[in-house]
Amino acid sequence: MAFGTLFTRENNCRSTAIKAVAKANDIELNIVEAEKGNATAEHLKANGLGKIPAFVGEDGFALSECIAIAIYITSQNEKTTLLGKTKQDYASILKWMSFFNSEVLPNLIAWFSPLKGDSPYNKKTVDEAIKATEKNFAVVEEYLLHNTFLVSERITLADLFAAAIATRGFQYFFDKHWRAEHPAVTRWFDTVRSQPIFSEVAEKVELLETVTLTNPPKKADQPKKEAKKEAKKEPRRRPLPLPLPLRPAEAPAADEPAAP
């Protein structure tokens, strides 16, 4: 019997870690492909906005937000090591999941979505997203230079969740040159994605030699608007000159008698 239903869409990176821990814990989930903009009543029960991922358990328990769902599914195994060993580990897991969900992914989307034609292109917005992404991964690179994984020295839910989101960067932008400049992030990503718990459910991505997604798609050729034909203008007629005013009769001279 299924533990519950997960509303998502194919290759949704916020759902990858949920699927991974469910499989690792032998938890069966009904995966429902949510139609964008047409959420079912059951889907809306889990998330009133109709967003994904969303979860409804067989017991009726409804839950939205990817981090909450991932932790809930992971915690069904009381002996799991994916949530860390200490309270500090657990807090650190939440920290990294929140960082990748609220900082990393939105900027990656703002970078690749306009270039794919999925949203309107604005050069300033894309440039800002590129800068933010580089800044975010500079933080991750610095941390992973001194740590094998994001929390402690073994893989946790934070790594599964973060690697799924980082996949979008490696899929579209993190080419050979970028990887050479971020060896720690690259090593970590390769390590996590090679783990069966991740690879059995995650989207398969080929590492890039060079970036190809660099320009927005060309706008479809639009038929040229016909030039408006100017109406033939008739030559302006000069107005006729006004008649000169009549001159008043001259007054008689002072020494002449007035007419009777």
How should each PLM-predicted stretch be described?
Residues 104-105, 200-202:
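Proline-centered turn/helix-capping motifs that create local helix->coil transitions or kinks
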Residues 1-134, 141, 146-148, 154, ...:
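GST-like domain detector, emphasizing the conserved glutathione-binding G-site
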Residues 74, 165-166, 202:
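Active-site-flanking alpha-helical
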Residues 202-226:
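Intrinsically disordered, low-complexity mixed-charge segments
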Residues 128-132, 180-194, 198-201:
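Extended, well-ordered alpha-helical scaffold segments
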Residues 45, 162, 194, 203:
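Phosphate-coordinating loops and pocket residues in cytosolic domains that bind phosphorylated ligands
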Residues 103, 107-112, 150-192:
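GST superfamily/GST-like fold recognition
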Residues 44, 91-94, 161, 186, ...:
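Generic structural signal for individual residues within well-ordered alpha-helical segments
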